[in-house]
UniProtKB/Swiss-Prot annotation:
Swiss-Prot/TrEMBL cofactor(s): heme b
Cofactor, free-text remark: Binds 2 heme b groups non-covalently.
GO molecular function list: metal ion binding; ubiquinol-cytochrome-c reductase activity
Entry binding sites for heme b b566: 97, 196
Encoding gene (name): MT-CYB
Topology term for the membrane: Multi-pass membrane protein
The protein's name: Cytochrome b
Single GO BP term: mitochondrial electron transport, ubiquinol to cytochrome c
Amino acid sequence: MTIMRKSHPLMKIVNHAFIDLPTPPNISGWWNFGSLLGLCLILQILTGLFLAMHYTSDTLTAFSSVMHTCRDVNYGWLIRHMHANGASLFFICLYIHIGRGIYYGSYLYKETWNIGILLLFLTMATAFVGYVLPWGQMSFWGATVITNLLSAIPYIGQDLVEWIWGGFSVDKATLTRFFAFHFILPFIITALAMVHLLFLHETGSNNPLGIPSDSGKVPFHPYYTTKDFLGVILLLTLFMTLVMFFPDKLGDPDNYMPANPLNTPPHIKPEWYFLFAYAILRSIPNKLGGVCALVFSILVLALLPYLHTSKQRSLSFRPLSQTLFWTLVSDLVILTWIGGQPVESPYIIIGQVASILYFSIILVFMPIAGLIENKMLKW
């Protein structure tokens, strides 16, 4: 088996990626989330495939086909709730994975980091078009509001919106194409994830100290396969608890009502994992400005390698930057809360302050903190 593992063309790729891969000996549990994201992706593709077998992408039957899946298909309710809550789990792992990358300076692997940002955009697009498919009230109005944002683009905005809709409003053509996008995008994400891994294995993993660890690397198997397996067990326990006991906790009650274009919900909002970006969008009174802020709230991550001013890679020994990092995390929690609140005082001003703080920490305070810490090293 050992000979085949190292000589067979296909097995050799697997061997270099998951078995004999030289890995830093000191990487912590925060490095588990890459493999957990892979698990989430496989889970979403499998459950989505079974849901697609019973789904019809027609405005008249989409809602009832989802209800039919829950009521009449064997374990359809379980598959549907696993898929819906799997998206939340996916984004929890994704945000922790990005947070770990920021904390330990992994963004200095530029190619890996930029492909990661592209993966984030694609995952957000997949989740958005997927949210439209059940054709409930929030699905319909969420699709209408978010796609309408493109009309803020000068000159071509309105034409672009109508082109995406396939008509003059969100209708059958929109639903059909969103289903097509939702089906194909996860496979594109899978391919990109492999490229992400390819670039990571070119440089090797970073570690909590942020220093080279070539002299002391250990094989990935059995050390980190065992460690990842523990993460998988913990994640699946949390996930199945959520699915079995609180399946609708993270959803919107409005989505249990069929879409009605004549009745607008009192408060239109996306799923919880988009609320921070939605709060940033709403904090700017100008439509085009809001859309630019929304896109830049994610794109700003691409600037991190160029804003790195510290002589140290990781935040492990940088107390000032650590304080700013956890302030940023707290700020994102506040933005998530604000995104779910109605547009009224005091939520408007809180959202605006939190949005300014979000960009200030990343673009101004963290680079300055890095320079101050460099000075402190000389003292």
